[in-house]
């Protein structure tokens, strides 16, 4: 997705190693031309490849989930990763996060995966998307601001990938297009450790409304599920093992990058 650690300073006269049509989503900042040398230095930062979603670049895997059916009692979970070698996206659709898809030194270093899950809270469906901004190692901390910007810029493409890969679900349940999208940015830096509501799914997929600067941010947090087991909510234990401590920042959140913090049942935690 975004090999931020391997971003190159490419002279403007050199041809990039990837096709022009795949570099449209790059964040390019050209410095002033040097008076001594007639060429620019262009730092290139890539995240999800093309800014415009290309279905041909998406590989969809259904793991323990029927492609044409949505389980009534369990949430639907998406795990999206990108290969810098093939420039293709891999989307796993299952009932829990696909941890095997996140193995390998590159994935652990760059942390460019995006995971999401459908939740039902008090009878209402919503899509919860998680992005890792910083924490875990110092390099991600240094570029937290850039990672936050790029994730915001490219998330509409991610949502399109979710919708395309799980098209049977959305075709059978068109009302999900109106479901709100909650985006969780996980960071050990309070400024970027936040939750944003991007509005209904159909609106969140509109790229021109989300450029990392203009999208509307929520001033409230998602509604919590019922504290006790009920029929109007999905299970309160999230299928995504990342910290959800956006409600109250604690010292333990400094390790949020590890993605291994257990998410407690909010109802049982009171007891």
Curated annotation (Swiss-Prot):
One of its GO terms (molecular function) is lyase activity. Residues 1-54 form a transit peptide. It catalyses: chlorophyll a + 2 H(+) = pheophytin a + Mg(2+). Keywords: Chlorophyll catabolism, Chloroplast, Lyase, Membrane, Plastid, Thylakoid, Transit peptide. Transmembrane segments: none annotated. Induction: Induced during natural and dark-induced leaf senescence. The keyword Thylakoid applies. GO terms for cellular component: chloroplast thylakoid membrane; plastid thylakoid membrane. Coiled coil: none annotated. Interacts with the light harvesting complex II (LHCII). Interacts with the chlorophyll catabolic enzyme (CCE) RCCR. Belongs to the staygreen family. Magnesium chelatase involved in chlorophyll a degradation in the chlorophyll-protein complexes of photosystem I (PSI) and photosystem II (PSII). Contributes to the degradation of PSI and PSII in the thylakoid membranes. Required to trigger chlorophyll degradation during natural and dark-induced leaf senescence. Mediates chlorophyll degradation during embryo degreening. Recombinant SGR2 possesses high dechelating activity against chlorophyll a, very low activity against chlorophyllide a, and no activity against chlorophyll b. This is Magnesium dechelatase SGR2, chloroplastic. It comes from Arabidopsis thaliana (Mouse-ear cress).
């Amino acid at each position: 997705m975004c090999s931020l650690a391997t971003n190159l300073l490419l002279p403007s006269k050199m041809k990039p190693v990837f096709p022009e049509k795949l570099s449209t989503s790059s964040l390019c900042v050209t410095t002033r031309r040097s008076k001594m040398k007639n060429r620019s230095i262009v730092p290139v930062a890539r995240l999800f490849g093309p800014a415009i979603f290309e279905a041909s670049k998406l590989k969809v895997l259904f793991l323990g989930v029927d492609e044409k059916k949505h389980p009534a009692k369990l949430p639907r979970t998406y795990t999206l990763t990108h290969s810098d070698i093939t420039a293709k996206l891999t989307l796993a659709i299952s009932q829990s996060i696909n941890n095997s898809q996140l193995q390998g030194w590159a994935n652990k270093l760059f942390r460019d995966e995006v995971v999401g899950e459908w939740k039902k809270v008090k009878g209402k469906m919503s899509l919860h998307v998680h992005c890792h901004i910083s924490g875990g190692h110092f390099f991600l901390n240094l570029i937290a601001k850039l990672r936050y910007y790029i994730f915001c810029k490219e998330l509409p493409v991610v949502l399109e990938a979710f919708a395309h890969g799980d098209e049977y679900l959305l075709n059978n349940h068109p009302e999900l297009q109106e479901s709100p999208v909650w985006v969780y940015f996980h960071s050990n830096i309070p400024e970027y450790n936040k939750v944003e509501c991007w509005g209904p799914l159909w609106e969140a997929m509109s790229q021109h409304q989300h450029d990392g600067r203009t999208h509307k941010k929520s001033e409230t947090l998602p509604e919590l599920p019922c504290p006790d087991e009920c029929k109007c909510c999905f299970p309160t234990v999230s299928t995504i093992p990342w910290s959800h401590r956006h409600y109250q920042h604690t010292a333990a959140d400094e390790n949020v990058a590890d993605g291994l913090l257990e998410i407690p049942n909010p109802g049982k935690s009171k007891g």
